[in-house]
Structures are given as C-alpha cells and as structure tokens.
Amino acid sequence: MSAEKKTERLFSLDLLRGLDMVLLAVIGPLVRGADQAWGLPKPVMAQFRHAWAGFSLWDIIMPMFIFMCGAAIPLALERRMRDGRPTGAFWRHVAWRFALLWVLGMMAQGRILTLDPMQISPYNNTLQTIAAGYLITALLMLTRSRIVLIAAPILLFAGYGILLACFGDYTETGNFAYLAEMAVLKRIVPEGSKAFQVGGYTWFLTTMMFGFMSLCGFHCTAIIRSALDTRRKTAALLALGGGLLGLGWLLALRVPVIKPIFTVSFTAQAMGWCVLAWTVLYLITDVCRLRRGLSVVILYGQFALTAYLCHTVFHPAVNRTAEILAQGLPRIFGETAQPFTLACVAGLVITGIVWVRSRMKNETIREQGMGNGGQEEGNGRDGARPSQPSTVDA
C-alpha cells in the first residue's frame, strides 16, 4: 500500500457522521421541544418518529451509523495488516472495538448497570449493531478474493429477505426475525426478563442486515480509494446509490418497508440514501475542498461516541444540567418556550462536552508528537483528521 493511501483523509466521512449525530442529539430534541412548546404540524413530527411501516428521516440515523462504520474499517485496519495478512495489532484492535461497543451498548440501552438479570438485555442497541457489522466486515476483509467480498453482502441481503418472505409474515409478532429473536432469548435470559420486551425490534437474525450495511460502506470506501479518476468514482457511487434506492422502491411493491426488522425494501432504500449522501459530501468537501463553517459538525463527527453517550447513558445528567442553567430563562422567553429553551441549552451542554473531549484528545496527540521528536502528524488546518480514529465506528 502506498504512503498516500496510508495518510488519506476523508473529510466527508467525518462530516456525514457529524450530521447524523447532530440530527440525533441536537436537532431531534429541538424539534420535540418546539412541538411541546408551540405544536408543530403532524407531517413534520412524523419525520422524527419511528413507525412500524414506512420511511422517515428519523429512520435513517441507525443505518447511516452502521454504513459509516463499514466505510471507516479499511482506513483503520489496513495499516494494522502486513502484506494483506492480519498482525497482532489487527486482532487486538478488532477485539477491543467489538468489546467496547458491545458493553457501551448494554450500558446505553441494555440496562447492564442495574446488575439485575431480569432487567438486562444482551443485544438491543445501535452500538451493538455497529459492533456486529464491524466484526463481519473485519473478518471478510481478510479474504483475498474480490468475488467473496462482492458476493458476501449480496448473500446476506438475499438470504435475510428469503427467510422473512418464506417463514412468518410481516406483522410485529409474526415475522420470522421476531420468532427467531424470541427463540434465542428463551435460551440465554431468564423467563420473564425485560429483555423479551423488544418493542418490535429484532437483533439476532437481523445481524445479517447489519453486516450487509457495514459492507456497503466498506465497498464505497474501496471505490473512493481506487485508482479511478474522480468522474468515474462519482459515477460508480451514484450508480450504486441509485441502484440500491431503486431496488428498495421496487421491492417495496411486494415487501413492506419496516425499519424495526430491517426488511430488504427498507434496508436497500436506507443504503441508497447513505451512498448518495456521502457521494454529494465527498464531491463538495474532498474534491472541491469546500469546508468552511463546518467545524461544529466535524467535531460531532470526530467524537460521535462521546456525543452519543451524552445523549443516552448520561441523558439525565445533561438534562439536569440544562435545567439548572436555564432556570431563569422563562423570565426572558416565557414559560411556554421553556421546553424548546431546555433543548437548546442541553444541545449546548453536549457541544461543550464534545469540545472539551476534543481538546483533551488534541493535547494528548500534541504530547505524543513532542515525545516522538515532533514526527507525530497533527490536525490539518481545515480541521480534518483521518476518519479512522472515531471511536464509534472504527
């Protein structure tokens, strides 16, 4: 691998990750606060909720995180391989990332901190889906066969679709993914456990789709880093994104678009939008180098895991801090606006925490660079860092 590829930076990947995180942790709460304060039109609020069937803006958040995980994997792991073979550093990195994301997922949503076997859910969070997709993609990355790499996502996608089509139906408790979920849970958690309350979401069998989505991101990175010129790279990405989107729309004629179980019609549409969104940002920021005014979003992209944990595990603490800081604001903006005001302050609190985290990270990098005689590479003037260090996905 050339030195150029080793130091390649993808500003657009951090930007897309940041936009996804800002939507989840800042924009969503702001919209709900505005709705609580003044009431927003139902069509607007429908875009910020998960329905059983259909596709909303809110539905794209989780698939996009999994997609970006796969996109970042080659950037993080290829430098831990030697002549295409994994080193000890490769396996340590994969094991650490998988374990970290899995445990943090159980902290965020699996209630592991209760230490109550009747409360704990072993597998029910976005971070764990990222870990699952990460492991599948990392292992497939070891193959030297391009045919296997191309066939794997197709087989995962088709296999999952066939299973759901041939067994069960597409109702909340009658689909095959749900039946498989219950069968697995009965064998690993106590009877009567809260883990059985899945709210229609499925995880174990649906891991096939998490692998598919991660591999979609992996192949997009392969296209971007290929020897093709920019025009052909763009054409390939647009063809892939448009093809996936069209496939999703076509499948929707027979297969319901259902996010909680990631039906093939939903997943193909989600991946189509992810590929197209990244293509646009790649052209704007990595090709045309238009990057001004994006520092806050990039901050969220580079420290997405910190922002995510603030939004989930430490959500009560963030909200309480916002309440303390905003307690006098009703005198200025009125009581009616307080839900929206609290959401604004909570967003500022999360942004402040992420900024502090970035300063700590940059200081650590600077000290390491000084310890290495100033040879350690730092941040560029445009604020971009290599995409792979983001804890949430690589």
List the predicted regions and their residue ranges.
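Acidic/polar hotspots within intrinsically disordered regions
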Residues: 372, 379-382, 393
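Short, low-complexity intrinsically disordered segments enriched in A/P/G/S/L with frequent Arg
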Residues: 383-389
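Alpha-helical transmembrane segments and their immediate juxtamembrane cytosolic regions
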Residues: 1-367, 393-394
